[in-house]
């Protein structure tokens, strides 16, 4: 383990340079063309065969020459966010309005580092390490196409990493059970009847209905859901009306729900649909709701978490299982429905570098790049531990 960690440490400068290259050229979900091509060039350098799934997903296949068999899948997401970077750094985003503000440039870099190290250890394992460079995590459209293409078929384990600005740099959070919420997206369209604002009785005010509904939705959380179960309903957009002096004929609400169980997911959908219909009907209007399933609740396998902890310990990386539940979603959860696995969090917060302690999805977000070799080492070592059980002993 010490030798593998040292191999990754020696890649430090290369990994930092690669991460900065990705950071300068962010691309949004399903449009990661430059990113995918750059990943392919790195895999070519390592002698790792690869294929495209869809337009921008890249899958590398590394087959060992040693004893043993099996398949372990390692995943990194590659897409960026529609956020303007405000950091004044040499590697800041060169694309206006886009930024790697969630660490996906780091995830991609760590997995490429692991690929390079593992390619030099082909004789040390049998079976296959499969590298999933997944697009479109931020819009919930990346994992399911890879599953549909059979990329998880036959896998013994699936493992992924995400940067964490709430954990000290150089540590890893790996928590059994629930970690990230399931995420649904909804649009509610309300239909009323237009009238002059001076004669509201002749119309049906879709804006008023929408306003009542926004408030009523919070009662689903406070009065129709167990207070010990974390759920969230958030409405981020409300559009209505066409004139200041007319009763609004239509209104549109757009929002999201977050939850940690299938039962809560079904309950939220059912009660939101009912609230929209009943409140609209009370005032003479109608409503319909559309739903998009962005991500399943992310639940780590306890046994796999133990495996990851043992590998991290052998690498000299401190671990914690005390990371708080997150109401943000991640479609890595879809892989965990297919096979046993775990999603770990790589601490990247360094108080000496204040921007590394800032939450993601902000224009001033950054990471401590000294953690990149650790992420690469954990990816590589975990894969070896699965394919060669003697490796971690």
Residues covered by each model-derived region:
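Acidic/His- and Gly-rich active-site-bordering loop/insert found
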Residues: 2-100, 105, 109-125
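General structural feature for long, well-ordered alpha-helical segments within catalytic domains
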Residues: 11-18, 31, 35-42, 70, ...
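Divalent metal-coordination and catalytic microenvironments
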Residues: 22, 60, 74, 104, ...
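Active-site beta-loop-alpha junctions enriched in small/polar residues
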Residues: 27, 77-79, 136-138, 164, ...
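Non-cysteine beta-strand/loop elements that form the S-adenosyl-L-methionine
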Residues: 73-75, 84, 186, 343-349
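Histidine/acidic-residue-rich, glycine-tolerant segments that coordinate divalent metal ions
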Residues: 81-83, 87-99, 105-106, 111, ...
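Metal-dependent amide/peptide-bond hydrolase catalytic core
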Residues: 211-393
């Amino acid at each position: 383990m010490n030798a593998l960690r040292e191999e990754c440490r020696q890649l430090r400068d290369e990994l930092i340079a690669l991460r900065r290259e990705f950071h300068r050229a962010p691309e949004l979900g399903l449009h990661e063309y430059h990113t995918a091509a750059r990943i392919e060039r790195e895999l070519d350098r390592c002698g790792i065969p690869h294929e495209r799934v869809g337009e921008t997903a890249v899958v590398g296949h590394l087959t060992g020459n040693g004893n043993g068999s099996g398949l372990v899948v390692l995943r990194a997401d590659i897409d960026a966010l529609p956020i303007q970077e405000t950091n004044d750094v040499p590697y800041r985003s060169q694309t206006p309005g886009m930024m790697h503000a969630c660490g996906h440039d780091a995830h991609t870099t760590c997995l490429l580092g692991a690929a390079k190290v593992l390619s030099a250890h082909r004789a040390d394992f049998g079976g296959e390490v499969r590298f999933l460079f997944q697009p479109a995590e931020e819009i919930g459209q990346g994992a399911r196409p890879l599953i549909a293409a059979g990329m998880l078929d036959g896998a013994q384990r699936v493992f992924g990493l995400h940067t964490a600005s709430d954990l000290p740099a150089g540590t890893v959070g790996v928590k059994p059970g629930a970690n990230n919420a399931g995420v649904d997206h909804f649009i509610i369209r309300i239909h009323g009847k237009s009238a002059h604002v001076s004669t509201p009785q002749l119309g049906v005010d879709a804006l008023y209905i929408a306003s009542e509904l926004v408030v009523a939705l919070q009662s689903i959380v406070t009065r129709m859901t167990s207070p010990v179960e974390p759920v969230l309903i958030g409405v981020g957009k409300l559009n209505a009306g066409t004139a200041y002096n007319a009763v609004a004929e239509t209104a549109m609400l757009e929002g999201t729900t977050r939850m940690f169980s299938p039962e809560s997911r079904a309950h939220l959908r059912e009660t939101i649909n009912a609230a929209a219909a009943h409140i609209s009907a009370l005032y003479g209007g109608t409503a319909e709701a559309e739903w998009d399933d962005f991500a399943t609740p992310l639940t780590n396998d306890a046994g796999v978490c133990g495996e990851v902890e043992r590998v991290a310990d052998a690498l000299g990386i401190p671990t914690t299982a005390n990371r708080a539940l997150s109401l943000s979603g991640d479609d890595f959860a879809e892989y965990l429905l297919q096979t046993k696995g775990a999603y770990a969090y790589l601490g990247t917060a360094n108080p000496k570098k204040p921007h590394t302690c800032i939450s993601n999805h902000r224009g001033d977000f950054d990471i401590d790049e000294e953690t990149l070799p650790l992420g690469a080492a954990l990816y590589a070592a975990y894969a070896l531990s699965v394919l060669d059980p003697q490796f971690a002993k």
